[in-house]
Swiss-Prot record:
Main subcellular location of this protein, as a coarse class: plastid
UniProt biased composition (Basic and acidic residues): 257-271
Residues covered by region (Disordered): 257-278, 1498-1521
GO BP term (any one): protein transport
Similarity comment: Belongs to the TIC214 family.
Membrane-protein topology: Multi-pass membrane protein
Subcellular location: Plastid, Chloroplast inner membrane
Known role: Involved in protein precursor import into chloroplasts. May be part of an intermediate translocation complex acting as a protein-conducting channel at the inner envelope.
Protein name: Protein TIC 214
Length: 1791
């Protein structure tokens, strides 16, 4: 029951998965998604829903809905139907259909009778309104959707259309899905409208609110009535929107097209993508087909710069003589070619009227200009993007049509051409099932026939028949069976290898000289098939025949149609008939019976690629000036980013060597310019768009600001800075608040404010610059204004100010400063700069400065000063302040349009130092001094006033005392003479009481006296005192009554002094001072006026008297300067003489110091070394032995502390050794312990001593482990050289397979491991630290079995360190001779010697070798011993250990294909000279090496071809075999040739660098960009100046020029640059077009047999035959079933052998088996059986024998390609899944 339930659940899940993945469901899903792609058609649909009411309204709704659905149905049909898709997808559909209809509809809607919606009595079908509504919705639905664009949806639909089989079902289901979505959407819209109409609250409340005010009274009614107007406005917006998208045919400039060429023509101006074909492909040979299949990589030919005359167009095209009538085998004559020509003319005449209409309406080239231009780097013309990178075609495999991704391109092109020309060639497609059954039957029949044939041959072998009956013969092309006459082997399509001859080609950088074309060009054989297929012009062909007779030398290429034929005679008439059938002879020579070596070029089959018919160039190319030679000067067609050409430096004096080599070149420009391209800061809105072309809107870009730095999509809205209203990032806000709350340091806030302020300034500056850039004539206007402002400032304004200033000084009786001002004025320089601020010179204007712009930089700007300070009065404090502000001060500025000065162009004007500022400062100082003096006088008078007041006070006190005495006396008198009256007594009493009150309060009386005394002006204090005393008695008497009344009111407040008493006292003092000053001033005015008059007269007469004194002083100074210059020159010459005498200046200063008797304190801290060594130099040299030993062996110590001058001196005198000089150690920072070890010299043993210490056992182990590695070091890439040594060692592979069965079994295991482990290989980083000592590193790499040779330690580094590549495979030339001399000996000896030589490459030798510009890539030394697997085995590390094993049998794996290291050896023929226009630098010792194909090993096939040569010795070519053997010997003994060397040219070095090492990118380190650019700008100015010393010194003082970045060393290598951090080199993975096919090519290259490696020389073949015959004699008496013959399948030919393998391992009738590919998860039909490998092979001897018979180990890898092609029934490059086959099926023979 449980099983049943699980079964039901599994079925349900599978059923659900099938339903979900079905075509119908997916189509419904995609169709439902397209509902949301809202377009302008919804406007009319909603308009009909909203506005129309009544019967006519319902009819309009129905018509709108039907039109809408019909339009969408057309769109869905266009997905499936290609013509409709092309018609609707073109942008011109909008032009033709949309815009006129939209405009008509818009103006029709605005008609006055448009709103008349009354019912009509006409027939409904005749009602135009309903039809217009239908047409509106139909046409609008065809337009592109714009509110919610569905580009991604369309791509998904296209992808699924490609995948699914039932496409029509998918289209219909998607339409149904759209219909469902549309119905739901419209129902939702209808419900919303009904809800709005029925909802009373919305209608009443909102309307009441609006109606309350009179202003909005009729708004609702107006809105309801003007719905049609709103829709018409929306329609107008769509019209304007589409206006921007249409390609307007008006006002477009027609492009200048390239020359009209034929569809398959071959001129170099055609610039088509052509597939390079083999010279004569043998379509009948399967092996040849495999190689052709791989070799068909796109070779793109761009020869736009080589314009060829029309007379020389014959050299690529294949020609046919139409005048001569062809002759068939039957002898019938026909004029077939002329018939083809007539048919072609008829077709052209029929189509003449169709072309203008199509190009007018639906031209994809947009009348005159295309829609968009996508530039291809390798093709000058614009190839349209319909061209695919890879080629695939349908082919029949396993009886069914399948897509082959490696289909031969030329084969498909050839079949297309044949089908066009010959209608009968077209095949009718049979049903797939019928064809598959027929195919399986044919294969079964083939298999049975091959079985029988194979069994018969084995039986013949058992019966010991002759070899002719056993081995299969090679098929030959025979034309007479009775006479057994065959075609010559050169032309036999069934043959291959050496019998087909060789192809000679000229390599790059070479041309054909006159000696090469010495032989007359005779008759040529031309293929008749090419003549049938290609269109040939008679007149051109006749001209070519005449050129052959004139011995024309216009052939640029030497690709001959046939490959080096031998001179042979025709033997019979039948042979000539067959040749006449295949070929026609152009008789241009009397010797028509011979074949000449040199032939005319053949036509390569071309494929017409979709491309534009014109040639355009971009703005950038115009700025770079690359295409000036080829294209006439016209405006660039492609718009690029705004850029300007900045000329940094123009070299008017080129190098003499280069100039003499290039003087014959007419296009050579003597003014070599260094140019930078400066891009604008604004956004790139016009990238790669052709000028005048249409602008398809970019849906993904939105413009946010007026000046936007970078364009970006709204998808990145969350990453940009937004307003607070748009920002919803709460987490970021909280972070920012907390950060601001926690931040305590206010300095950071200030820095941030400064940075923000500088950013704002920079943005403002850029805005101004972009405004100047945006207008057309703005730069011209600005340039003229700047130049006029510069002239006005320099020559008018500043001299005028100087004159005014000095004249005013003369009027003020001061000394004029003419010389100082003129000196400062002359120092000011107006340097003309480029728009990018690169300074040129004062007189030189930048190129195109009116259009590109100009900047004027003012160096040492002149500021008018009221006076000049003397230099001697500057104090130490002033000096310190000056040095502190030196870096901040800038002695330059830029001129603005208004004549102001700015620090940067387009910046804000900074304030100039004012002229009156120092004057006001000086006046303030003088006023301060005057004030201090006046205050001193006042202080003196104040002290005097104090003394005077003190005396007056003492007088007052004396008077008061006297007054009290007199008063007492008077009282006494009054007491003595009393009058007896009552009144008087009472008065006395009152006076007594009053006196008591006066004594108690004396201050009041004094104040009253003081107040009264202030009123009295001209009276003294003493006189008033007496009067006051008398009057007081009277007043007291008068006031007795008042005092008695007020006595009660008196309080304690009367006792306090009043507040104003102190103020009155101070004012009194001031008044007295002022009064005294006035009197003094009146007295001294006369003397002051007299003093002023005297000073004026003295100033005038003093200035007149001082004029001759100033003149004499100037003369004295000029003579002193001249005298100082002469003294300085004498000192310089004396210094040069002293340098020649090798004197030490430090020691001479000590001598001067001793001789000088004056007591002057010198600082001898810097002279301590010199003093010590001076004392040592006075001693004898013999006493230096100990010191020399110490200093020599402690180099690390002495070189760091001893000065260079002292070391140079002692080195020249022989006192010290030269090693005392300073050394640059490798990585001294990280290797300090190594430097310490170097200082301990007793442990630094020489290499010979180290070699003795190594034990023999360890050495042998190293040599055994490094056997594989040293084979590659023996002779690089020479397959032939190793063959002899390997055959001598192993006695050939056949004998070895017979004699050493155990070793062969071990090899089989290695082969299996080689195949299976490559799948599970892990990626490893190719990296090695530079710090490891190379001797130990190499030894450890040889001892340990690392994955990649030369790698011991792995470090986590992201890029490949190129420095490690120079330590191993680059050797010196002195090692080369030793390797070449030992190459004659046995292989084992060379291995041992080479391994020792590897250990002898030391680190110091590499560090001290001479380095040049391209030394880091190894371009200066010849690569002698290049390891084979150095680069390609990075992908397959496990292949390294087995590479030598495969190299022993080079026919198994083509190492040249897999391990191609791009180092080909160049052998130069005597008859071929190098092109004189190309120079290779002297440092590069020709490591671009090309193989000479004539010296490769001859291609003879396998062992059967050798046996065939024994049977048919007349077929062999002994002369060629001798040449091959001689080439073997030459390649071994050959030494490098001394070639002519040229001096390096910068352009050639750059070209070599880019072509060979284009995968490396050089970039500056980011923090050095500004420094280096600033240095470059200063260099540009200094180069142009005659006396650059002053400006150089000032720029160094201002820290503008960095001396650390100066290239002081001449030979500055990349290693040092990288150490300093100036350059960083990172590998850049470029997407090269051929890379994908090269990877496939190399993957299959493992499994392909390279024919050059099949060749066995005659000597080795004899040895193999001897070994086989000896072994046969030994095994005669053995049983036949245990016969140990190496491989029975070798009885068959190679082609039949592979066919037999595949047929025997396949069952063609069973179709049920399936192979599931786990990598791509696809079900691929499989017809092969997979047998598991048995584990007990070693136990069972019979199984072992069967394995040896039928495993075929020497052809194991060859079968891998066949497995992919035949067993998996696919050709799609999934080459790693084929290694899943563990074992081949065994051959089952039924006895």
């Amino acid at each position: 029951m449980m099983v049943f339930q699980s079964f039901i659940l599994g079925n349900l899940v599978s059923l659900c998965m099938k339903i979900i993945n079905s075509v119908v469901v997916v189509g419904l899903y995609y169709g439902f998604l397209t509902t949301f792609s809202i377009g302008p058609s919804y406007l009319f649909l909603l308009r009909a829903r909203v506005m129309d009411e009544g019967e006519e309204g319902t009819e309009k709704k129905v018509s709108a809905t039907t039109g809408f659905i019909a339009g969408q149905l057309m769109m869905f049909i266009s997905i499936y139907y290609a013509p409709l898709h092309l018609a609707l997808g073109r942008p011109h559909t909008i032009t033709v259909l949309a815009l006129p209809y939209l405009l008509f509809h818009f103006f029709w809607n605005n008609h006055k009778h448009f709103f008349d919606y009354g019912s009509t009595t006409r027939n409904e079908m005749r009602n135009l309104r309903i039809q217009c509504v239908f047409l509106n919705n139909l046409i609008f639905q065809l337009f592109n959707h714009f509110i919610l664009p569905s580009s991604m949806l369309a791509r998904l639909v296209n992808i699924y259309m490609f995948r699914c089989n039932n496409k029509m079902l998918f289209v219909t289901s998607s339409f149904v899905g759209w219909l469902i979505g549309h119905i739901l959407f419209m129902k939702w819209v209808g419900l919303v409208l009904v809800w709005i109409q029925q909802n009373h609250s919305i209608r009443s409340n909102r309307s009441n609110v609006l109606i309350r005010s009179n202003k909005y009274k009729f708004l609702v009614s107006e809105l309801r009535n003007s719905m049609a107007r709103i829709f018409s406005i929306l329609l107008f917006i769509t019209c304007v929107y589409y206006l921007g998208r249409i390609p307007s045919p008006i006002l477009t400039k027609k492009l200048k097209g390239t020359s009209e060429t034929e569809e398959r023509g071959g001129t170099k101006q055609d610039q088509e993508v052509s597939t390079e074909e083999a010279p004569f492909p043998s379509l009948f040979s399967e092996e040849r087909e495999d190689l052709d299949q791989i070799d068909e990589i796109d070779e793109i030919r761009v020869n736009a710069k080589e314009q060829i005359n029309k007379d020389d167009e014959f050299h690529i095209r294949t020609y046919y003589n139409y005048n001569k009538i062809s002759e068939n085998i039957d002898g019938n004559k026909e004029n077939s070619n002329l018939e083809f020509l007539k048919i072609k003319k008829k077709e052209d005449s029929v189509l003449w009227f169709e072309k203008p209409l199509v190009t007018l309406i639906f031209d994809y080239k947009r009348w005159n200009r295309p829609n968009r231009y996508i530039k291809n780097d390798q093709i000058e013309n614009a190839v349209r993007n319909e061209m695919s990178q890879y080629f695939f075609s349908a082919c029949q495999s396993d009886g069914k049509d399948r897509i082959s991704f490696s289909y031969p391109r030329n084969l498909s092109t050839f079949s297309e051409m044949i089908q066009k020309k010959i209608p009968s060639f077209r095949r009718e497609k049979n049903p797939s099932d019928q064809f598959s059954t027929c195919w399986s039957l044919i294969n079964e029949e083939k298999k049975e026939n091959l079985k029988k044939e194979f069994l018969n041959r084995i039986e013949a072998l058992d019966k010991e028949w002759s070899v002719e009956h056993i081995l299969e013969k090679t098929t030959r092309f025979c034309h007479n069976e009775t006479k057994k006459e065959y075609l010559p082997k050169i032309y036999d399509p069934f043959l291959h290898g050496i019998s087909r001859g060789r192809t000679q080609r000229l390599f790059p950088f070479q041309i054909i000289t006159k000696t090469y074309l010495k032989n007359p060009i005779g008759g040529s054989w031309i293929n008749k098939i090419h003549g049938i297929l290609l269109n040939i012009n008679y007149q051109k062909f006749e001209q070519t025949i005449e050129k052959f007779n004139r011995k024309s030398s216009a052939i640029k290429k030497n690709l001959s149609f046939f490959s080096d034929p031998q001179e042979e005679k025709y033997k019979s008439e039948e042979e000539s008939k067959i040749f006449k059938f295949l070929f026609d002879v152009v008789i241009a020579d009397s010797n028509d019976q011979t074949l000449i070596k040199n032939f005319m070029d053949f036509h390569e089959i071309h494929k017409k690629v979709p491309r534009w018919s014109y040639k355009l160039r971009s703005d950038l190319e115009e700025l770079e000036g690359e295409n000036e030679e080829t294209i006439p000067l016209e405006e660039p067609g492609i718009r690029a980013r705004k850029a300007k050409r900045v000329v940094i430096f123009t070299d008017t004096e080129p190098h003499n060597e280069i100039y003499t080599n290039l003087k014959n070149n007419k296009n050579y420009d003597q003014n070599d310019e260094m140019v930078l391209i400066r891009y604008s800061q604004q956004s790139d809105f016009r990238r790669e768009i052709i000028q005048g072309s249409m602008r398809p809107q970019r849906r993904k870009t939105v413009i946010w600001e007026f000046f936007q730095a970078n364009m970006h999509s709204p998808l990145f809205f969350d990453r940009i800075d937004k307003f607070f209203f748009f920002s919803f990032d709460i987490r970021g806000l909280t972070k920012q608040i907390l950060r601001n709350f926690m931040r305590k340091n206010e300095k950071k806030k200030l820095d941030k404010k400064d940075a923000e302020r500088s950013k704002r300034k920079e943005k403002g500056r850029l805005k101004i610059a972009e405004v100047w850039d945006s207008f057309f004539f703005a730069q011209i206007l600005r340039g003229f204004l700047l130049v006029t402002q510069s002239i006005l400032r320099k020559y008018i304004l500043l001299p005028l100010l100087i004159i005014i200033k000095n004249s005013v000084r003369m009027l003020l009786f001061q000394i004029p400063e003419w010389s100082e001002d003129l000196k400062d004025w002359k120092r000011e320089m107006h340097v003309k700069c480029t728009y990018n601020r690169v300074p040129l010179s004062e007189t030189e204007f930048p190129r195109n400065w009116l259009t590109d712009g100009i900047q004027i930089k003012i160096l040492f700007p002149f500021y008018l000063k009221p006076w000049h300070k003397s230099k001697f009065h500057s104090s130490q404090k002033g000096r310190l302040k000056k040095t502190k502000d030196k870096g901040k001060k800038k002695d330059f500025c830029f001129l603005t349009v208004w004549g102001m000065e700015t620090e940067l162009p387009f910046g804000s004007a900074h304030k100039q130092p004012s002229f009156f500022g120092p004057i006001s400062k000086e006046l303030k100082k003088k006023m301060k001094k005057y004030k201090t003096k006046s205050f001193q006088v006042l202080r003196f008078f104040k002290e005097r006033d104090k003394i005077f007041l003190k005396g007056a006070k003492e007088i007052k006190n004396w008077i008061m005392k006297n007054f009290v005495f007199i008063k007492g006396k008077r009282n006494d008198l009054s007491k003595g003479n009393r009058i007896p009256l009552l009144g008087l007594r009472e008065i006395d009493e009152l006076t007594e009481t009053k006196n008591d009150s006066i004594t108690s309060n004396p201050i009041i009386h004094e104040l009253s006296v003081q107040n009264r005394s202030m009123e009295w002006k001209n009276s003294s204090f003493s006189e008033n005192k007496i009067k006051n005393s008398i009057d007081r008695i009277n007043t007291i008497r008068n006031q007795i009554e008042a005092i008695s009344k007020e006595k009660k009111k008196i309080t304690n407040s009367c006792n306090k002094p009043p507040y104003d008493s102190k103020i009155i006292e101070s004012s009194k003092k001031k008044w007295q001072i002022v009064k005294s000053k006035n009197t003094r001033l009146i007295r001294k005015t006369f003397y002051f006026v007299k003093f002023c008059i005297e000073q004026l007269s003295l100033g005038i007469f003093g200035g007149i008297i001082n004029i001759p004194r100033i003149i004499t002083q100037l003369l004295f100074e000029s003579t002193k300067q001249i005298r100082d210059k002469s003294i300085y020159k004498n000192e310089e010459t004396q210094e040069k003489i002293n340098k020649k005498k090798n004197t030490i200046y430090l020691i001479s200063t000590i001598k001067k110091f001793k001789s000088n008797k004056k007591k002057i304190s010198y600082d001898l801290c810097s002279l301590s070394q010199a003093y010590v060594f001076y004392k040592l130099s006075q001693l004898q040299v013999s006493n230096f032995s100990k010191l020399r030993a110490v200093l020599e062996y402690n180099i690390c110590v002495t070189s760091l502390f001893v000065k260079n001058q002292i070391k140079d001196f002692f080195q020249e005198h022989g006192i010290f050794h030269y090693k005392l000089k300073e050394k640059t150690f490798l990585n001294s920072e990280s290797n300090q312990w190594k430097n310490w070890l170097r200082s301990h010299y007793q442990y630094n043993l020489p290499e010979i001593v180290w070699a003795r210490l190594v034990t023999e056992k360890w050495k042998n182990k190293i040599n055994q482990d490094s056997l594989v590695l040293n084979q590659s070091l023996n002779k690089e890439d020479s397959y032939e050289k190793n063959q002899f040594d390997n055959y001598k060692k192993l006695n050939s592979f056949e004998a070895d397979s017979l004699l050493n069965p155990k070793q062969n079994l071990k090899k089989d295991y290695i082969y299996n491991l080689f195949c299976y482990n490559s799948i599970n290989s892990k990626e490893t980083i190719f990296d090695m630290p530079l710090d490891i000592i190379i001797d130990n590193f190499l030894v450890s790499s040889f001892r340990g079995k690392s994955n990649i040779r030369g790698i011991g330690k792995f470090r986590t580094r992201k890029f490949l360190d190129w420095r490690i590549l120079t330590f191993w495979f680059i050797k010196k030339v002195n090692i080369e001779s030793a390797v070449d001399t030992t190459s004659k000996k046995k292989n084992i000896q060379t291995q041992a010697q080479n391994s020792e030589r590897i250990h002898k490459i030391t680190k110091t030798g590499l560090a001290n070798q001479k380095k040049d510009f391209f030394d880091w890539m190894g371009m200066n030394e010849e690569i002698l011993n290049y390891p084979i697997a150095n680069f390609d085995f990075l992908f397959f590390p496990e292949f390294v250990l087995f590479s030598s094993t495969y190299k022993i049998k080079p026919w198994v794996i083509p190492i040249k294909l897999l391990l191609f290291n791009f180092n080909e050896k160049k052998t130069v023929n005597k008859k071929i000279t190098r092109n004189q226009n190309v120079f290779i630098p002297s440092n590069e010792t020709k490591n671009l090496r090309f193989y000479n194909l004539t010296k490769e090993s001859a291609d003879q096939g396998e062992l059967e071809s050798d046996n065939e040569k024994q049977r048919n010795p007349e077929l062999a070519l002994p002369n060629q075999e001798k040449n091959i053997e001689e080439n073997y010997a030459e390649s071994k003994i050959k030494k490098p040739e001394n070639k002519k060397q040229y001096k390096p040219n910068t352009e050639v070095e750059l070209d070599l660098f880019l072509t060979r090492y284009s995968r490396f990118q050089l970039r500056w380190n980011f923090f050095l960009n500004t420094k280096i650019l600033n240095n470059i700008k200063i260099y540009c100015l200094l180069v142009r100046l005659k006396n650059p010393n002053e400006i150089a010194i000032s720029s160094i003082e201002r820290a503008e020029m960095n001396l650390d970045l100066l290239m002081i060393e001449k030979n500055f290598t990349f290693a040092k640059l990288m150490k300093k951090g100036i350059l960083i080199i990172e590998p850049l993975r470029l997407s090269v077009k051929n890379d994908g096919q090269l990877i496939i090519y190399r993957t299959i290259g493992i499994s392909l047999v390279h024919k050059n490696n099949h060749q066995i020389s005659q000597r080795e073949k004899k040895k193999i035959e001897k070994a086989i015959t000896k072994y046969k004699k030994k095994t005669v008496n053995r049983k036949k079933k245990n016969s140990d013959f190496f491989a029975p399948e070798n009885l068959l030919s190679p082609k039949r052998r592979r066919e037999f393998r595949i047929l025997i391992c396949s069952k063609f009738k069973t179709k049920s088996t399936r192979y599931r590919n786990s990598r791509f998860d696809k079900n691929i039909q499989n017809c092969g059986q997979v047998l598991n490998q048995k584990k007990d092979l070693d136990k069972d001897k019979t199984n072992l024998m069967k394995l040896k018979f039928f495993l075929w180990p020497n052809f194991r890898l060859e079968d891998l390609a066949c497995m992919n092609r035949y067993w998996f029934n696919t050709n799609n490059g999934n080459h790693f899944s084929m290694i899943r086959i563990h074992m081949y099926t065994r051959l089952k023979i039924n006895s």
